[in-house]
Amino acid sequence: MADAKDFLFEIGTEEMPSAPLNNAVKQLGTMIAKGLDEAGLAHGEVRVISSPRRLAALVADVATATDEVHEIKRGPAANIAFDADGNATKAAQGFARKCGVAAEGLVRREDTDGREYVFAEKNIPSAPATPILTALCEKTIAGLQWPNYRSQRWGHEHATFVRPVRWICCLLGEDVVPVSFADVTSGNTTRGHRVLGPGDHVVASPAVYEQVLEDAGVLSAERRREAILAGIAEVEADRPGCHVDTPKKVFEEVINLCEWPTVLVGTFDEEFLKVPHEIICESMLTNQRYFPIYDGEGKLTREFVVVSNSKPENAERVIDGNERVVRARLDDAKFFYEEDLKISLDEFRERLAKVAFQEKLGSVLAKSERIEQLALAIAREAHLGAHLAADAGRAAHLCKADLVSNAVVEFTSQQGVMGGYYATAMGENDEVAHAIRDHYRPRFAGDELPEGTAGCIVACADKLDTIAGIFAIGEPPTGSSDPYALRRAAIGIINILRDRLPIDPTSLIDFALELYSEQGIEFDAAEVAQQVRDFFHGRLVSMARDEKVPADTVAAVSAVHIIAPSVFFARCAALDEARKNDAETFDNLATAYARAAHISKPELGVEYDRSLMGEAELALADASEAAQTAVDAALVAEDYPAAFAALAALRAPIDRFFDEVMVMDKDEQLRDNRLKLLNRFEAVFSGIANIGELARKK
């Protein structure tokens, strides 16, 4: 067994962007561990340390050499490897070549299965770790991927990296491992903070690496996170009731923007609090990575948190500089908002004629007109009052107007939000303003639904218009490709219709496509409508499975092609509960239903002749008629537990029927009459669920 030493591989660069750095951190540890394993170098824990200017792997207890190995590989069967004369066949020669041995050296022996095979055996001598580590590090640094970021060529070679590589520190114990990349060769030095610890710093061994960094003004990502969180906690403790808003994406980016974080608090002028807080906060978060501070009532305060890449003694100068920067940014936001208030939303809306929605689907103005008509149709379908329908129509009329406003052009994520402010400013009522503000919701999984009913209507209309249009031009989602986010839009509609607007979207899909036809878009309306219905149905099934509804329950309900979300999920819940309460009945009923479906002939219809029936047949006929009446009444009342209880009552008569009646009688008249009765039995289920899809427990 070889000795073991700690190993360090550090790539030093110019400041790397946060997102690719995080991605590289995930890659580096995996690549190093995999490379060591494949090379046969024993090792301990692999840790990755990063900062804006470095990416490093620290590996504990790396063997200084590989172990000597006696390698045995099994090849083809002996009768395939050698011909009748004992000569090696092509199969044996290929196997030997692959294993790096001569065909004559292959060994024949019986394996555990009793058959004779050929085996290649060879001794692989121990190899020193240093050359292996050199090759691994050079392969790793060249193999790091930078998705969504263009790698650039540095030095005189063809090597590329996301930022210029300035130094490489690579050590196995106290010994330098030679590594070269882009005209840079490895050594035993690292570099510290540009201001707090400039220049080269000797790393005597991997064990002292983190301490050397800290002494040079560089903390690891974990330490930086802890320091920032502690600083923010102190800020909040000094301001009882206040809360520092730290969105995850921005927070992670800030961690990767500094090497020695210091949490400071700055302020901006009171006048900026008159501007909608959403654009103030977005300006601070996205442009400067400042964290807003809210008071105990959730209102934005004049203070903000800035994370400085320096020590506290520089605080006054750093705060002053950041306050000057934030004032310039907020001046811009205030200017955009005040200029927008000089123009009505109706005037903004007319400008949408020059904004394309989609190349083949016309302008955003045309889209807003379709949304308005769809919103009114949804209000009618939901049987809402005239006042609420009018609010939904007005909100739909104006919902896209803010897209051409100054504030939204600058802060695109605030589309809808700014429209809500502008609607209030021009005298629209709260329902209209809130609907405009909320109509993009839900924007992602777990997002809130629109606050008001009008907002739910406009949100559904907007999303359904997009889905219908993209399907009409033949560009639906395929596999993992969904460039128009139609799956997300469909899930948004389903969540709204499930929780807030219990309506069936079938007729609305047809109407949405009709509006495109009136616009001159050519497509097969019936075919596309079916595609859209199938698309919604697929999302319903997927969501039910994600919610852990049993797969066979989902299959039973989805088999009757319901796309009204509230109905679909209510039926799934009722069937699942019925099965839990009386599993035996539904298992047996499922078996009987499947048997009936297997032999039935739908073309015979359901009109049977009672005069040809015996007692068991009459019992099933009476039970089917009674169950049909009960199911129909339950469906009208949306009492799905009652509907499934009515189906459960069919178990005894169908079991008796199959026990006592020969369905496929030689007498054609009797046979057909019994098949018609089974058709009638099946028809009872057709409007609620296909019980035959249920799993049978034996």
Language model features: what each stretch is:
Residues 1-698:
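Amphipathic alpha-helical "coupling" segments that flank catalytic cores
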